[in-house]
């Protein structure tokens, strides 16, 4: 027997039993972003490696350790996208979307990072991202947070997530703070682990994000970034907090929140849950006002967020919020000479007459008992039964699979009866 080929570690199949919950989540996301007037954009999965090196940062874990990078036959270095913002910015610049106008965009799709697979963290994972270009006020930052809060309510998880906010200021604000932070860390060099020592010289703000409890203990005495913010950054953050207060959205200011990608400035935020253990962040984002210019476009303010769909699916499963629409409404049962053709024709008529109805025809033979068992297995609410007598009389038996009642109707009127049942 030939050896079975397995899926790549950390890259998972989404099976028919799982896809309805995914569809429920994806539909909720789409309806939410549409309610705010945002438009979908679709970018390639593969981009030039240089895009992520320039946008995300050479010294970040994503670029230095986690990307799937390869040379194509022309010798060009290409990468499976590890995140969506850089590609979205590239698409906007290349297609002149943000030269003279604001853009409010969203996208959804797979991302790739070579990490150690564990619950809630995979090598192929899916994100929904929302990006806004051309607006620099705190009002649009607040709208994005309000958008996510609306999605949590629609999914029923709003009581199981909490919002953390911070302002990391402008590049100029951070320059003086970085100097003060490095000086502080050098005084405690013996406490720092190797990862923190590396970050101290490459991106010292990321030390604030450490999970090492010994380092966390000394950071309580570290310089506070808020004390180094300029007046514009302070006013922007105060405006955001005021808008969230007015909207009734609760939040905590976390001065150690810095996010893991280099392009952020001013507002950063995360939605966190306690339902998933270690992998607690389900959504994160912030401002990246310098990224468009950094990638060759004109100076353009921008803000966005991304949410991990696998983690949201895990949350829905953990909280037992898995009620999804059944996959089949009507099952067509046929037995006897000439019944299959009539049954398939009747199924097509139902699809034409009732928008969105899902009709499954039985194939492969079998007696009525076997066919009704299959109808029950796929979750059908109604069965249409056609035997030779029904075909001869142009009728069909409609059986309510929930209540058990059944009636015989003319084939021309059965669509109206089914519409009332489902």
Swiss-Prot record:
It is found in: Cytoplasm. It comes from the Bacteria. One of its GO terms (molecular function) is histidine-tRNA ligase activity. Its EC number is 6.1.1.21. InterPro entries: aa-tRNA-synth_II, aa-tRNA-synth_II/BPL/LPL, Anticodon-bd, Anticodon-bd_dom_sf, His-tRNA-ligase, HisRS-like_core, HisRS/HisZ, HisRS_anticodon. The keyword Methyltransferase does not apply. GO terms for biological process: histidyl-tRNA aminoacylation. Keywords: Aminoacyl-tRNA synthetase, ATP-binding, Cytoplasm, Ligase, Nucleotide-binding, Protein biosynthesis. This is Histidine--tRNA ligase. It comes from Vibrio campbellii (strain ATCC BAA-1116). The lineage of its organism: Bacteria, Pseudomonadati, Pseudomonadota, Gammaproteobacteria, Vibrionales. The gene is hisS.
């Amino acid at each position: 027997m030939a050896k079975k080929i397995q899926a790549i570690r950390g890259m998972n199949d989404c099976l028919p039993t799982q896809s309805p919950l995914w569809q429920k989540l994806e539909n909720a996301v789409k309806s939410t972003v549409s309610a705010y007037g945002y438009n979908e954009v679709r970018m390639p999965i593969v981009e030039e490696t240089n895009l992520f090196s320039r946008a995300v940062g050479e010294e970040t874990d994503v670029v230095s350790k986690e990307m799937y990078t390869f040379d194509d036959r022309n010798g060009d270095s290409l990468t499976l996208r590890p995140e969506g913002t850089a590609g979205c910015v590239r698409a906007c610049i290349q297609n002149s979307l943000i030269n003279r106008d604001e853009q409010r965009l969203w996208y959804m799709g797979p991302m790739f990072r070579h990490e150690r697979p564990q619950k809630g963290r995979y090598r192929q994972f899916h994100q929904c991202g929302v990006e806004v270009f051309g607006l620099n006020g705190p009002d649009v930052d607040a709208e994005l947070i309000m958008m996510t809060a609306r999605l949590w309510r629609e999914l029923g998880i709003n009581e199981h997530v909490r919002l953390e906010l911070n302002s990391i200021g402008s590049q100029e604000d951070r320059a003086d703070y970085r100097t003060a932070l490095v000086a502080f860390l050098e005084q405690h060099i013996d406490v720092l682990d190797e990862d923190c020592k590396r970050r101290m010289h490459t991106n010292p703000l990321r030390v604030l994000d450490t999970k090492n409890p010994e380092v966390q203990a000394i950071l309580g005495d570290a310089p506070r970034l808020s004390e180094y913010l300029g007046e514009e950054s302070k006013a922007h953050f105060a405006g955001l907090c005021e808008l969230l207060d007015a909207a009734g959205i609760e939040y905590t200011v976390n001065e150690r929140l810095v996010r893991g990608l280099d392009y952020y400035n001013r507002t950063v935020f995360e939605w966190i849950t306690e339902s998933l253990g270690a992998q607690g962040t389900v959504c994160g984002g912030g401002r990246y006002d310098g990224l468009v210019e950094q990638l060759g476009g004109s100076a353009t303010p921008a803000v966005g967020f991304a949410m991990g769909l696998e983690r949201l699916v895990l949350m829905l499963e953990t909280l037992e919020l898995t009620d999804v629409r059944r996959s089949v409404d009507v099952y067509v049962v046929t037995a006897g000479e000439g019944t299959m053709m009539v049954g398939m024709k009747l199924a097509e008529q139902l699809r034409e007459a009732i928008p969105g109805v899902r009709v499954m025809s039985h194939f492969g033979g079998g007696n009525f008992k076997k066919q009704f068992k299959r109808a029950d297995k796929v979750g059908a609410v109604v069965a249409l039964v056609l035997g030779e007598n029904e075909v001869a009389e142009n009728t069909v038996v409609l059986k309510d699979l929930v209540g058990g009642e059944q009636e015989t109707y003319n084939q021309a009127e059965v669509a109206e009866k089914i519409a009332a049942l489902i």
